[in-house]
Structures are given as C-alpha cells and as structure tokens.
Amino acid sequence: MRQITTDVATLSYTNGNQHSRSNTFRSQASGSSGNSRQSGKQSKSGGSGTPTSSRSKFTEQLDQGYVPSPVPAIAPAAAVDLHRRPTYQSTGSSSTLVGSALERKINDQDPYQKHDTTERLNALRELMKKDDLDYYVVPSEDAHGSEYVAVSDKRREWISGFTGSAGVAIISKTTAYLVTDSRYWLQARTQLDNNWNLVEGGSVGGPTDWIDFLVARAKDSRIGIDARMLAHEKAVLLNSQLQAKGSKLFYPPQNLIDLIWKDKPPRSKEPVYVQPLKYTGMEANKKLAKLKDWIKAQPPTVPSYSKTPPTANQMQVGTLISNLACIAWVLNLRGDDIPFNPVFHAYLFVSAEQAILFIDPAKITEGVDEYLKSINVQRREYNDVWSFMRRKEWGDGRIIITPQTSYAISLMLTSYRYTVLPSIIEEWKAVKNPIELEGLKSAYIRDGVAFVRWLAWLEYKMSQGYVITEYEAGWRLTEFRRMGKNYRGLAYENISATGANAALPHYVPHKKDEILIERDTPYLNDSGGQYLDGTCDTTRTIIFDRPTPEMIEAYTRVLQGHIAIDSAVFPEGTTGKQLDVLARKALWKDGLNYMHGTGHGFGSFLNVHEGPHGFSSDVPLVPGHVITNEPGFYKAGHWGMRIESALYVKRVTTKHEFNGNIWLGFERLTCVPIQTKMVNPDVLSKEEKQWIKDHNRRCLEVLEPYLREDKRALSYLKKEASRDIGISKPLVKDFAIDWN
C-alpha cells in the first residue's frame, strides 16, 4: 500500500469586487488499496498503476503557468492507469461568494434524492376537495412570469420533486402529471416518484404542451390555478378551449401550495442598487420619458365602425410593467432576489403624469431612495399594486399590459380597462446601445481569458493523470472568473458534464456525486459570468483521448452548423426562425438533430435568456441584437456535445444590394478556441476550414495581451491557433501520440 499526498501552498487573490479569499488545493495519488472515487454508479477503483514519480511540494504558481525546475518526470500516457489517478480537489469555495444571489452554490447541496410526495399530494387534494376542484395546476413561473424564480417561488418543484426550470404539474383527484419538454425528459424520469406520471410535451404523437394535455383530459371539469402564475395570453387560450369541453377555470383566493408548504422560505430582503450610466449608456429618466411618449402615441381603443370621438376611458393612459428584467432595465437598477439573475421583485406603473415603483421598502437604501426621487419615481409597498389596480387610482383611461402579464392583473382591471400589446420595453432592451455593446465585448474578453486559463489548466491536469470531477472542473472555472474585473457572479448554474450526463442539455453536477471526467468521451462545459458590463454564455466540448468515428461525425456536423449561422448574411427583415435551418442542415444530412433551440438573446448584466428575438422567434433580427449560436447533438445514455458562441447583429456590405435591401450579418463576441480533435477535415469545405483557423487565431490575437503572465495558458492558446484540424494518425492500434 502506498499513498502520496501533495499539499499546495495557499493562494490569495482579489477580484474586481474586492472579495479576497484563500484557497488550498490537495492532490492525492493512491496505490491499489487507496480510496476510490465514483463515476456515475460505477466505482473507478481497480488497477495499480500510478504516475512513475511522486512530486514534492509545489506552489499555486504551477497553476498560474510557472513550472519550477527541475520539472518532475511525467510518465508516458500508456503507463498511466486512468482508473487510479491522483485526485484534484478545490475546497473552500463557498467562503468566497460574490453577491447574495448572483452566485449561490446551489449545487454544493447534497445531490437530489427522490422523495415520497404522497403526504404533500394528499394535503393538496384535501384543499381541492374543499373547493370542489377536479384538477389543480401548478406552473413553474412566479407572479412576474419569470423563467428562473426565487427559492420561495419554486412551488412546482416542491409538490413534484422535479427541479428543472420548465414544466407544469397537473394534479387530479387520483393522479398527478408532470408535463415538460424534451430537455428534461431524462431528468424528470429520474426525479419523479411513483405518484407522478411524466407527460412528454412535444413528443411524436403526444401533446404539444400542458394546455393541450389538460384540455384533452378535462371534460365538465372544474380546474383550479393561481391566476397570478398564469400569463394573460395562456389564460385566454385555455379558457376558450376549456369552455368548448364544458370545463372552466377557478381561481382560489390563496395559492393552495402556499397553504400546505409549512417551511416555505421567505423572500429576499437584499437591497437593490443603481447600475451606473457608464454601463447602461442611457439615463433612467430618458428611458421613462421615451416610454411616456410611446404611451401618448398609442391610438385609443374604439370600435372600427365608430364615428364619434374617443371617450376618456378609451384612451391609453399608462402601462403596468411586471417583467422584472424590464423594470430593472428601465430604472437602471439591479437586485439579488433570484439566483444568477440581477433582478428584484417589483411592479412599475408609468403614465404621462407619474411613475410608481411597487417594492418592499426593506430593499430600498437611503441612496436608492434619493435616486428614485431624482428621476421622479414614487415608491409604494409591493402588494399595494393590487389595490391600485382595483381602485383604478390612475383615473380614466386604459392600461397597456403585455401578453405575458399575470392574468390576475387583467382580471382585476376588467377588459374595459386594459389593452394588450407586445412589450415595447422588451423590444428596446433587446437592441443594445453602443455603450452596452462595448461593455459586452469587454465582458466576453474577460470571460474568454478565464475560459482559456481554465482550459489550459484542465488539459494540463488531465495530462498529468489527475482525477477531476465534473463539479471540481466547473468550479475551478468559476475561480478563474472571479479574478476578472467587474465580476458579479455566475449567469446560471455551471453545466459541467461528462459521458452520459453531457447528453442532458441542462445537467448540473453536485459536489457529493463525485463523477469523474472521462477521458474517452466528450466533456461539455456550458457556463458564463455576470459582469457589471455584460452577461456571458459560452459552451465548449472537448475530449482528452481519441474520439470514436461516431463522435467525430456528430461533432463535425455540429461545428458545420455553428459556422453556417456565424457566417450567415441575410436581408433586413429576416427572422431568427428563418435562419434556424442553417444550424441543422449539416446534422440533417446524416439524420441527426437536436431538440432545443439554436439560440437566444441575452442581457447587459441582466438575464441570460432574453427576448423577443431568437432562432425560434418570428421577430426580425436588427443591428444591436445579441444572440447565442448553440447547435448540439446528444446520444442519450452515452455522450453529448454543443458549441455555443455569442454574436451580435450588424450591417454588412455586400457585392450587390438587390432591390436596395439592407444586408445584415453577425460578429462574434465569444473569444474561446474551438477544439478540433473531433473534427473530420475531409468533410469540411475550404471556407469552413479557414473559418476554424481564423477563429482560433483571432482568439490568440485578442487574448494574448491578457495572458502574458500565464505561460501555460498562452502556450495552450498558441497551440490551438496553430494546430491542424483533426486528430493525429494512430501509430499502433487504438493508440496515438499527440506531441503537443
């Protein structure tokens, strides 16, 4: 029995937010009797091989690119037993959180354990019986229609045990259903207990969504739902379809889940703060003035046959904003109420005469209070919005709401006092101004620096034969991000996945799972930082050993789709949906596909998912839009791959301008090399090969000035910029030497 322990000196550093920390790393190489780590359900124990030489103490300088002399001997790859590798552990990260909600190590918690929901369902059915309900519906969203919600708003997760961000629970008198889309089918099968039936929304021959499923089952039924959690447009659709089946919706005065959720956590009291003009590019009072002018310009709601002048009650006089990101954008405020999303719970009413922010007063500091006064925004209690609506305190006229506004609000207003229009703020927010765009460029450079330093570190550690788990790899990348200027936390939970886990598009590792990164299957990392000047979202897929022909075929097709989107030139008025096929065309040639969207908009230090545009949207792309480009392929139960870069839309010059059209294209924001080991150069066009070389060389050109002090990262970057496309030819069967 033999055990080697290497202690690494403590590293202290300070990031852009002045949060300093100390971290200690420990590596262990064990003999045949040492402790083993787990990969999935299978133990990684077995074999007796170890690196041929033990290593004496070395400092964290090694992790910064400095290699002490003499360099320890490294065993040839063939001599390293991958089932018994020295371990790498990143400890103490929880002591360095930046922001109370933007970077919460939710996956530090114990892995999700399937629990018995019988008691909770029985309690819910008792309340349903009192209200004579045949069904009760529990959506994922909160009262603001948020995609990602605070812990206190995770009602569907609490009742069902399913932790995915999308899905609707439908509970009948005897049965419980969970309806979710293809991204979460495998996860739901794992997490739901025997009380639940998974309904695969969008599957072949199955229901399109939860509304389709419910309408098909409900006949002469009374269906309960919290109207606050139901969007206006969905409520109108659902009501019309249910009426045809003799069924109707019922809105209990209190949320039934809240009545039985005894240990429901309280809402955040974290203070909101002002986002400076140097990042927003436009003062809040100018945004409010623009919004007021837009309200005044909206035509009155009058019948088409009317020949009389509009009355006061037919005029559009104000708007109620419930979308949290829209409120944050208009007021140039940010908050910490929802993990990874810098927003805060509030409503905002704006008319030509006034602006009122409905918010918990505990969240308003003296400085923010003075700021609100300076932009002429009144402040009232968060829940006062309901009495304000009920009493029609603004006076005569109609209020503009969006299709996504809570149905409870439109019920309170009645149809004579509201007008439904697409969100003008979503439209404005999506088009980044020059300051926001420059901020995003800077943020993506800093995020790229962190990503490259991490890739170099990970490749080095794996080449040394270290054991690294999915969790440890993901949080090591977070540690590199923390060093960046303006860092405010993660934009979403780290997706760090190996093997079969990479086939789950929204998989998140947990600390205690201890799932090892496999060398012979693709490893996928989808992550991004929140910076004061931008929100980042990047995915790269890499492999450490020789890929199989099947992996090469799929990865090459994914990359071809990625290049096709990136290189697209299109006339003004083209929608994202019209371009979506470009990302899938190469995959379709081989009968392959992916079930998620090709890309989405994202914010300027706001939410990582932002509309209204996207590659699934009918909204035309315009200069200033930013959008992700993320085709992928997933072999369920085996491996998955995705390549994601961020783009912005700009005007381009073409050889001809047919019919006087304006032509548009994309420019890449992401500056992270793309590994070419899984690429088959024989199926690439000349232009595609050149694109890959140009991209990796551009990464070197842009990032080199920031990496001169990190020799290992710079060496990695230069290697990727000069590497030939494809893998080296095997010298012997199933074995190759990569001299790089």
Predicted segments, located by residue:
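Active-site neighborhoods and metal-handling regions in enzymes and metal-associated proteins
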Residues: 2-740
